[in-house]
């Protein structure tokens, strides 16, 4: 599988297997520097996998989880991350080849623990000095309009010190958050990359508004004309647009 994928993909691959023998076979035939995704805080896992990473020069992702599962608090996750870091260094793996994943919990099920992930990430970056990785879109699972949550959480995580985001690079909203963040944090000098990407683009909201105006004009009406609205809510909408508070209140009561 590794050979087949590398024959058509030029980007680095992340190898994962719960069986150390299978993982080593993949590492042995890998061409270049692989990434092992992942180890966790369990001693037996660290003892089996880290020597393989050292032997084959692989970078490794460490999950801040152990036999007790994902801890809700930031301190507990940082403690696991510290354990992984110490084991990796003891195995001879350079610190720059270690990426810690503090694990994203879904806001729909564990809303009060969302900030713990960001806090743990920040501590791993500032106190442990390790690189960080995070599955961003997990945050919005089970909720509507997921892009709103994903882009906001991505921005929070980047500000906390996120190095690698597991995300959909085809999402225009997500990429816009990255480009804008790099401008505002001076990572994009002179806003060069931002300008190259967006100088000739029309925001989606502007394009939609223009399309609506064109549709209204095609019907021989002007924006705001009564022809735009119909049905039982039309009087209320017109009253709101004209700022007629009394009429709006009366129409609202009539609709209740």
Where are these regions (language model features)?
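Signature of multi-pass transmembrane helix bundles
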Residues: 14-16
């Amino acid at each position: 599988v590794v050979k087949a994928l590398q024959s058509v993909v030029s980007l680095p691959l992340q190898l994962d297997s719960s069986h150390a023998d299978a993982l080593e076979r993949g590492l042995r035939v890998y061409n270049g520097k692989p990434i092992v995704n992942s180890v966790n805080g369990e001693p037996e896992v660290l003892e089996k996998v880290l020597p393989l990473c050292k032997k084959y020069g692989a970078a490794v992702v460490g999950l801040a989880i152990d036999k007790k599962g994902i801890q809700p608090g930031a301190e507990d996750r940082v403690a696991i991350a510290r354990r992984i870091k110490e084991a990796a260094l003891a195995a001879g793996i350079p610190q720059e080849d270690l990426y810690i994943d503090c694990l994203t919990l879904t806001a729909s099920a564990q809303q009060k623990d969302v900030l713990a992930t960001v806090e743990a990430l920040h501590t791993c970056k500032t106190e442990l000095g390790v690189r960080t990785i995070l599955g961003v879109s997990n945050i919005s699972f089970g909720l509507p309009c997921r892009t709103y949550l994903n882009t906001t959480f991505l921005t929070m995580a980047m500000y906390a010190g996120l190095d690698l985001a597991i995300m959909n690079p085809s999402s225009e909203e997500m990429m816009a958050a990255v480009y804008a963040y790099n401008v505002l944090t001076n990572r994009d000098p002179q806003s060069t990359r931002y300008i190259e990407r967006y100088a000739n683009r029309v925001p989606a909201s502007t394009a939609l508004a223009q399309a609506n105006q064109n549709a209204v004009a095609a019907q021989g009406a002007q924006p705001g004309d009564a022809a735009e609205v119909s049905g039982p809510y039309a009087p209320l909408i017109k009253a709101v647009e004209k700022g007629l508070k009394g009429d709006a209140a009366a129409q609202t009561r009539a609709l209740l």
